Each structure stands twice: as structure tokens, then as C-alpha cells.
UniProtKB/Swiss-Prot annotation:
Protein name: 3-isopropylmalate dehydratase large subunit
Record gene name: leuC
Oligomeric form and interacting partners: Heterodimer of LeuC and LeuD.
MF terms (GO), sorted A to Z: 3-isopropylmalate dehydratase activity; 4 iron, 4 sulfur cluster binding; metal ion binding
Stored NCBIfam families: leuC, PRK05478.1, PRK12466.1
CDD domains, per the entry: IPMI
Length: 469
């Protein structure tokens, strides 16, 4: 019997597997940030242990950093302490750190791939739930807790049970203007926020193969939002072209050897998945979440669901609670919903392709007078490239704020946050209650949709944006 891509990677990394015990797998790459690592390093220090493979461990600062200044004190005492601890720990244990003043500093799931730290066939972990992002390269990548962070630092291994496999095939081509964000939100809308629980998802199909690496990262980033452990896309020529020449990618003469191996990393034709879901790409429209989990999502040309449309009493109760929190009335057109803030950024949508898409919409327009709109590049290199292309000038002339790299308004752990009752069109990955600030109301959209909302002051369909403008 053939193997799935997940099974091939997992089997290649098993260190120990015996009956009645959880298998132990080897971890190729460990990414670290300031929030989930301090206690892990303290654990090593207390037990007199070293980092077993410091050359396979890389750290950056992202969650707590200010996007307006490089001052370590800007976001309060807790943020300062966590960043100072990360600097101390990385120096003591010999771990590479991209700190606030390093040109590579940025969101961990943006920094890793762009430096070539993320490679096909690897196992990658980080103390962050959106580590699944790296699965876009055909790597088995997933988030871990702080105690597991300590374990990987000490042993370069992790106990990990075998997971079920789910194949999601997006058949056909998407319409113009439909992005990876729309694809993944449509998938979550179909499966629900728990539809992938217990599975490793492999995304396949013509629409997936057509995505850039940035798009595939957006896709895999949100696999966790349907409950999955990880998301995978098999590596192909798009993957290899992205990786070639990057700092930590194999260099000649090892490059050809690496590519030959990477080409074997695909599910066999006779591989059996535990479940399969198919999506028609042509039916996917620009998506907007209306509720308080990513599964509460509809197309831009639809109305906010009526409560009597939910047959399941649990779903109906959830929808009723979500509508109350979001301050929405059932049956309202999405395009009639006004917004207060716009956030373009996060590990989901802060790469150069995302900024280009938003700038294309913003060019020649002005942000609505009542809207605050911020653009936060995902890393130093993304910021530098955007500025070299003049994207920063387009945003600034349109009335957007151009910021420094960081996680920013994705989560309320720094100075970028919503005030109670404020409504935000956000390119991030979670719209839970209070995610962007206590009482804040989050709607998840693509970068282009976020830019259009900023200009109109309400949600707008980018398919008719030129006409509306």
C-alpha cells in the first residue's frame, strides 16, 4: 500500500516506536519567540541541561514588539521582560536570535521560510499554534506547548502519536481576484471550525497547485482554524524556485541532490486517506467572517445569516451569541456593515504578495475619513522589498499607516489593538471574542478586501471595486 505525504515524513523521523508507547520523532527545526520560551529555558537552566542542537534552533521577537518604534520599552513591562529574557537565554544557550535591531527580525512564520529555514520533508515545531504555516513547503510543522518547547530544546525529539489524514482537493480554477485566504475561509466555512480535528490535512488540486508559496503559506497557516494538527502541500517546482539561493537552503552541489529527494515527497497514487473532501474552486467568492470563529463565514454578496437558517440548536445558539457580540442584525448585507479599523498583516497575510495585492487596490484612493488603517509587513526583508517597490508610498499617500514588522493587531499583546465596540477588517487568522482587544469585533478577509474596506469605510466586493469606486 502506498503512503501519504504525511506518512512519508513521519516515518522518516521516527526515533523510537514500541508497543503501548507514544512514538518519539526527531525534530529538524525548532523556531522560538519571546512569549512561550522563557519558562522552557528556565527549565533547562534548573536541570543543568544545554540546548542539544543550537544550530537547529532559531529565535526572533514578534508577538510583543512595537510596530511604531524599536524601543524595547514601548509595549510595557511584560513585553520588555520577555524580550530581555529571550536575548539573555539565546546568548547563554548559543541560539541564533533575530532581535529588534536585526534586519531579518519579523514574525516567526514569515522569517523562517524567507531565510530558507523551512525545507521540504522537515519536521518543524514552534511554541505557536500557527506553525502549520510551514506545511506549505511539504514540511510536517505544528505548534507545541512550553513544556514541549523545553523537551525539544533538551533532546531535539518529541513524543508524537500518528494522526489521521484528510485530503482536501480544490478542483478547477478560481475566478479572478480570489485568493488563498478566500479559498481557506471557504473550506473552513464548509467543514466548520472543528472539521479537521484529529487530522493532518493535505491540500491538493488544480487551484492549490496554482498558488504561489505565499498563498500556500496562507492556506496552511489556517489549517489549525478548522481544528487540524497541521496542513501540507506537496513540494513542486514552485517550491523549489522559491527556496533556491536562500540563506539556509542547500547550496550547490547539494542543491540538485536535495531537489531529487524533495520530488519524492508526494502522496502515492494508491495512498489511502482517512477522509476526503472536494471543493469546486469556481464557486468560491471573496469571503468575510461575520461571527466569532473562522467557520462563521460567508461570501461578500451574501447576507448575515438568519437564526432560523440554522437547524442544529447548538449552531443556532452559537450564531445568536456571535451576532450579539458582533453587534450585527441577521439578514443585513455585508456591504452595509461599516468598519472602524483595518489591519493588513499577521503570519497569515503580511508577505510581499499580500502587500502588493492591497497596494493595487489602494493606489489612487483615500482611506475613509472615519477609518484607521495600518499595514504591518511581516519581516524586515518584506518591509525592505515593499519599500524598494514603492508600496509604502502608495499606502501612505492613500492614508494607511506604514509600520515596522511584528505580530501587531493580530492579537492584543502589544499596543496595536481594538477598543471596545470597534469593528475591524483584518487579514489575520482568528476572530474570537477579544482576540484583537477586549470588546473588539474582528472580520477576517483577504488583503485586497481589507484595502477595499478601508477606502469605502465598509465591506466592498473587490470584483466590482472599480465600478463602485
Amino acid at each position: 500500500m502506498g503512503k501519504t505525504l504525511y506518512q512519508k515524513i513521519y516515518d522518516a523521523h521516527v526515533v523510537r516506536e514500541v508497543a503501548n508507547e507514544t512514538p518519539i520523532i526527531y525534530i529538524d527545526r525548532h523556531l522560538v519567540h519571546e512569549v512561550t520560551s522563557p519558562q522552557a529555558f528556565d527549565g533547562l537552566r534548573t536541570k543543568g541541561r544545554a540546548v542539544r542542537q543550537p544550530n537547529k534552533t532559531f529565535a526572533t521577537m514578534d508577538h510583543n514588539v512595537s510596530t511604531q518604534t524599536k524601543d524595547i520599552n514601548a509595549c510595557g513591562d511584560m513585553a520588555r521582560i520577555q524580550m530581555q529574557e529571550l536575548m539573555k537565554n539565546c546568548q547563554e544557550f548559543g541560539v541564533t536570535l533575530y532581535d529588534l535591531n536585526h534586519p531579518y527580525q519579523g514574525i516567526v512564520h514569515v522569517m523562517g521560510p524567507e531565510q530558507g529555514l523551512t525545507l521540504p520533508g522537515m519536521t518543524i515545531v514552534c511554541g505557536d499554534s500557527h506553525t502549520a504555516t510551514h506545511g506549505a513547503f511539504g514540511a510536517l510543522a505544528f505548534g507545541i506547548g512550553t513544556s514541549e518547547v523545553e523537551h525539544v530544546l533538551a533532546t531535539q525529539t518529541l513524543k508524537q502519536s500518528r494522526a489521521k489524514t484528510l485530503k482536501i482537493e480544490v478542483q478547477g480554477k478560481t475566478a479572478n481576484g480570489i485568493t488563498a485566504k478566500d479559498i481557506v475561509l471557504a473550506i473552513i466555512g464548509k467543514l466548520g471550525s472543528a472539521g479537521g480535528t484529529g487530522y493532518i490535512i493535505e491540500f491538493t488540486g488544480e487551484a492549490i497547485e496554482a498558488l504561489s508559496m505565499e498563498g500556500r503559506m496562507t492556506l496552511c497557516n489556517m489549517a489549525i482554524e478548522m481544528g487540524a494538527k497541521a496542513g501540507l502541500v506537496a513540494p513542486d517546482e514552485t517550491t523549489f524556485a522559491y527556496l533556491k539561493g536562500r540563506q539556509f537552503a542547500p547550496q550547490a552541489p547539494l542543491w540538485d541532490e536535495a531537489v531529487a529527494y524533495w520530488k519524492t515527497l508526494k502522496s502515492d497514487e494508491d495512498a489511502i486517506f482517512d477522509a476526503t473532501v472536494t471543493i469546486n474552486a469556481a464557486e468560491i467568492a471573496p469571503q468575510v467572517t461575520w461571527g466569532t470563529n473562522p467557520g462563521q463565514v460567508i461570501a461578500i454578496d451574501q447576507i448575515v445569516p438568519r437564526l432560523n437558517s440554522f437547524n442544529d440548536p447548538v449552531e443556532r445558539a452559537s450564531a445568536e451569541k456571535a451576532l450579539a457580540y458582533m453587534g450585527l442584525t441577521e439578514g443585513v448585507n455585508l456591504t452595509d456593515i461599516t468598519i472602524d479599523k483595518v489591519f493588513i498583516g499577521s503570519c497569515t497575510n503580511s508577505r510581499i504578495e499580500d502587500l502588493r495585492a492591497a497596494a493595487k487596490i489602494a493606489k489612487g484612493h483615500k482611506v475613509a475619513s472615519h477609518v484607521q488603517a495600518i499595514v504591518v509587513p511581516g519581516s524586515g526583508p518584506v518591509k525592505a522589498q515593499a519599500e524598494a517597490e514603492g508600496l509604502d508610498k502608495i499606502f501612505i499617500e492613500a492614508g494607511f499607516e506604514w509600520r515596522l514588522p511584528g505580530c501587531s493587531m493580530c492579537l492584543a499583546m502589544n499596543n496595536d489593538r481594538l477598543n471596545p465596540g470597534e469593528r475591524c477588517a483584518s487579514t489575520s487568522n482568528r476572530n474570537f471574542e477579544g482576540r484583537q482587544g477586549r470588546g473588539g469585533r474582528t472580520h477576517l478577509v483577504s488583503p485586497a478586501m481589507a484595502a477595499a474596506a478601508a477606502i469605502h469605510g465598509h465591506f466592498a466586493d473587490i470584483r466590482t471595486f472599480a465600478t463602485v469606486s
